[in-house]
Design a protein with these regions (language model features):
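Short acidic amphipathic segments
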Residues: 2, 12-15, 30-57
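Long, highly charged amphipathic alpha-helices
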Residues: 25, 29, 33, 65-66
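Charge-rich, low-aromatic oligomerization/scaffolding segments with amphipathic character
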Residues: 58-68
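Short, surface-exposed ligand-recognition loops at beta-strand->loop->(often short) alpha-helix junctions
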Residues: 16-26
Length: 68
């Protein structure tokens, strides 16, 4: 998946998915996928902006690897 990290601080990352507009089904799949990860504290998906905000506890590289 192609993406751009828009903003990050320790424990939170905001990512924009590089596509047109995200469907509700795609947003649900992404939210379920990242909520199932052990490092995930909370996940918000904004389908109109094609953005994901992930609050995590753990290694940043693991989150970025799962985004790819």
């Amino acid at each position: 998946m192609k993406f751009v990290i828009k903003h990050e601080i320790r424990g939170r990352i905001r990512v924009q998915i590089l596509q047109g507009r995200m469907s509700i089904e795609q947003a649900d799949i992404l939210q379920y996928y990242f909520n199932a990860k052990p490092y995930s504290i909370s996940v918000k998906v904004r389908e109109r902006l094609s953005e994901i905000v992930i609050h995590y506890d753990g290694d940043r590289e693991t989150v970025v690897r799962d985004l790819q």
